[in-house]
Amino acid sequence: MFTPMPRSSSRPSTAHSWAPFRADERPVESTSPHGRFALALAYANSYHVGMSSLGFQRVYELVHATPEWSCERFFLDGDGPPRSVETDTPLDAFGAVAFSISFEEDYVHCLEMLARAGIPLRRRERGPDDPLVLVGGSCASINPLTLSEFVDAFPLGAAENLLPTLLPALAQEGDREAVLDRLAAAPGFFVPSRHRHGEEPDLAKLVKLELTEEQMRAPGALPTTAIVTPRTEFSAKYLIEMSRGCPEKCRYCWATFGMGRFRWHPTDAILEAIERARPVTDQLGFVATAVGDHPEIERILLEANRMGFRTSVSSVRIPAVTEAVLAALHASGDRSITLAPETGSDALRVKLNKPIPNSLLFEKVRLIFRQGFTQLKLYFLIGLPEESDADVEAILEVAARCRELMLEELAPTGVIGQIHLGVNILIPKPYTGWQRETVEDPKVLERRIAILRKGVARLPNVSLGSMSIRQAIWQAYITKAGADAADALEDAARGMPLSALLRRHAAAIETEVFQRAEGRLRWQFLRTA
């Protein structure tokens, strides 16, 4: 009989100790450490990255809020069999392991964790005593086929809509096959062993269950940090989700296509959440694809300041940068702002479906430095369709002008700020306007990155971070590939260097990455309910 409760395991203990991590954790609300049923909740990366994920923390909170249920967290840290943060229980002792994966590069980490736990990688090789392996998160909703040889079931969409089906299915009588039958019959779950018939899944049943605007306005619907810890990217910040979706429809961005139309959480719910954070921290982080577009962002920031919090935002759309928002953020102690112009060319930005002229960007950058901010991060993409070397040179022109504005506005303060350019390579994502496009020729990318490096070297107080071309090729492959990527993923999980990996699987990578996709796309069996 399948049981979701932890059982004894013969796996040896790992040298990695979670005791210092537990000591630093401050739960916002108390939770029961034990329930009749327990779920292994795994993040396929380090504790630092995983506990920075609001989605991961939201699932943890929701499971613990379910009567008779608890969950224990697992991360990539250490090199022995993974053990839980809460009780040091080994991963293979649980009846079900639910991974949250937001980045394609973590597919390999997921397999590494399974291998270290002694859990068979391929789903067909698992027996009745092996845990069920589930994968949720944004990657599952983009293209679950890549991992379909390894994963027993994919919950598709928002955890709030999926856990009420998943947890009872795990708790009912029956073996693992009975659980998979129950999930396959429910909306919002892709079960490869049940839905795969030859090359095509059963299209009629596969829907992605996202949160509706009405659900987001219901009591308890606001995702917030469940456990505050200094051991994250946000260092003891209490994170609050402001909205979902995005008012823009940029052709390269999955979030604008895959998360539904822009909708925001009620202001009263956000202010109540801020109040709950008081006992555990004085730092807040507001996160969303479009934080500044919440209709009451100014009121929220001012109220947070009044309560004595230091606040920051994940990023702000260029049109949403206002003097009032900047003043509130600066007053709370924030000195860094992130914008995403994506390209230096007005014309190319229009083709991105992001018609924001450089004149508006410069106006907002002047406001930012005039308000006293000293750190500006600008994100750009290269390898875009119809991009030229001149468009890449335009990125340098934008950086130079932003630097001039920084020096002009900060001169009276005697402070010299910093500008960082983060440059990524276009990875054509499923469900975006450019899902059929290819990755740019590596030689062209090398030349354009060299142009940027040479240009930035001439700009004091401007730094550059660029994506690895090899990593971009690998990410593009596993983003768009089907089940035939299993051998490559297994090679990567066993430690094959990236250069050797790209050589060994060159033919498949050439097809997926450098040839334009035609006809029906393999991932187009998912639809949003």
Please state what every model-predicted region is.
Residues 56-58, 114, 149-151, 170-171, ...:
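Short secondary-structure boundary/capping segments
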Residues 41-42, 272-377, 382-418:
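Conserved SAM/AdoMet-binding glycine-rich loop
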Residues 53, 232-268:
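Canonical Radical SAM [4Fe-4S] cluster-binding loop centered on the CxxxCxxC motif
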Residues 1-28, 35, 39-41, 449, ...:
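Radical SAM enzyme core and accessory elements
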Residues 10-40, 47-48, 192-240:
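N-terminal [4Fe-4S]-dependent radical SAM core
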Residues 76-201, 430-482, 489-500:
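Glycine-rich beta-alpha loop elements in corrinoid/cobalamin-binding modules
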Residues 248, 295-297, 324-325, 347-352, ...:
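Flexible glycine/acidic-rich beta-alpha junction loops that bind and position SAM and/or redox cofactors
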